Each structure stands twice: as structure tokens, then as C-alpha cells.
Regions:
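C-terminal binding/interaction regions
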Residues: 22-135
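Short Gly/Thr/Asp-enriched flexible loops that form oxyanion-binding sites at enzyme active sites
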Residues: 1-12, 16-20
């Protein structure tokens, strides 16, 4: 979850149960979730997982919970979004500012390159990776 939240445009929530899922959708209106599959996912886990997905998608995000708190929650979400916009940078900038040896090590595998270049939808990111590999 924390790793996801480090990237621009990602707001990930930790969802343990259906109540978490509902409140994350209503209060945070994020776009990614993390499930603790190694904890509490034994007998009947598929039921809990189904209920969590139902709560995530049963109503439009950002409606607030409780409903009478919608205005301050939406105001706070806008503040958080503005902070994230300033503090999170685009992937091209991140790739250029990381330690080149570290970044190159992350993208130099042949299988990574095969899958990445076949599926990358952002030419600027693809070009940044090519430049990194050429170093």
C-alpha cells in the first residue's frame, strides 16, 4: 500500500473487511486497494473478499460517511489531492532522478523489457527507459 501511494495519481487504501472497503470508497475515493491476503484469509475468505468488493463498488465514491460529513470530507480530499500533486512526480522525472545504477538494475532484465516495451502505453516513459538502458 505504501509503495503504491508513492506514485503520482495513486491513492491506495488498506482494506481488511467490508466496512474498510465501504469507508475507503466513501471517504477517500481512492483508486487502488491493498488486501492483507496472508492475514485473516483462512476459512470463508472468499465470502469476506466478495463482501469487500461489493462494498467498494456499491455506490459512487466520495459520498462521505456518515453522509452528513460529506462536505468536510470532500474538502479534506481536495486538500490531500493538492498536496499529492505537488509531492508526487511523474515517472519520467522519477526515472531520471533515481540513482542510475539502481534504476537500470530494475529495468535491465530481458523479461521485463519484453513485457514492458510490448505493453507500455506512454512513449515518454518508454523513451526514458531506453535512455536509462543506453547508459
Amino acid at each position: 500500500m505504501l509503495g503504491c501511494n508513492a506514485f503520482p495519481g495513486v491513492q491506495c487504501g488498506h482494506i481488511v473487511d467490508p466496512a474498510d472497503a465501504f469507508m475507503f470508497n466513501q471517504i477517500n475515493a481512492g483508486n487502488a486497494v491493498a488486501f492483507p491476503f496472508a492475514k485473516g484469509f483462512g476459512w470463508g475468505a472468499e465470502i469476506n473478499l466478495r463482501y469487500m468488493f461489493e462494498r467498494l463498488f456499491e455506490v459512487a465514491p466520495g459520498g462521505g460517511y456518515p453522509p452528513e460529513r460529506v462536505e468536510p470530507e470532500q474538502r479534506n480530499k481536495k486538500i490531500l489531492d493538492a498536496v499529492n500533486e505537488v509531492t508526487h512526480r511523474d515517472m519520467v522525472t522519477i526515472l531520471k532522478e533515481l540513482d542510475p545504477a539502481l534504476a537500470k538494475g530494475a529495468v535491465s532484465g530481458s523479461r521485463f523489457q519484453e513485457l514492458f516495451f510490448a505493453n507500455c502505453k506512454d512513449e515518454k516513459i518508454a523513451e526514458a527507459v531506453r535512455e536509462l538502458l543506453a547508459k
